[in-house]
A protein has these predicted regions:
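Amphipathic alpha-helical scaffolding segments comprising HEAT/armadillo-like alpha-solenoid repeats
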Residues: 1-12, 34-46, 66-78, 100-112, ...
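Alpha-solenoid helical repeat architecture
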Residues: 10-19, 45-50, 61, 76, ...
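Structural detector for internal amphipathic alpha-helices that build alpha-solenoid repeat scaffolds
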Residues: 20-34, 54-67, 78-82, 86-98, ...
Length: 135
């Protein structure tokens, strides 16, 4: 399956029942798991359909090991800039499962960046994440 076909499998259509759609994206997720690099699944931008595929893309990312996610941590924390974005909570929950020692530097960098940009939503999400990971 090509990347375009995977993206197509993630697009929801009103003609699908929930079961049909879940079956369709499961096929895409299983194909996407074969990809070594995660960039194509981190908030991909495709004309007119970008955000509708973010949730399944987040599910692909959540299946990866901590080691596989390490190079992408900054981008994954950026996904938390708006917790209303599709897939944000999938990423949030996956990051919570990682050892804090792996996340600490990137998390602190993102907090500084959010403050610098006056991005209150992102900062709130990062503070909430910090509270939950330290429980």
């Amino acid at each position: 399956m090509t990347l375009d076909e995977i993206y197509e499998s993630f697009i929801w259509d009103a003609s699908y029942t929930n079961e049909e759609y879940e079956s369709k994206i499961t096929i895409g997720i299983n194909e996407a798991k074969k990809y070594k690099y995660l960039y194509p699944f981190i908030q991909p931008v495709i004309p007119e359909k970008s955000k509708c595929i973010w949730e399944p893309c987040a599910r692909v990312i959540a299946l990866k090991s901590d080691e596989e996610l390490k190079p992408y941590l900054y981008l994954l924390f950026e996904w938390l800039q708006d917790l209303n974005w599709p897939g944000a909570y999938v990423i949030f929950d996956r990051l919570l499962k990682m050892p804090f020692s792996l996340l600490e530097d990137v998390l602190n960098h993102c907090k500084r960046q959010a403050k610098k940009e006056n991005d209150e939503l992102w900062l709130m999400a990062l503070e909430d994440f910090s509270k939950q990971i330290n429980l």
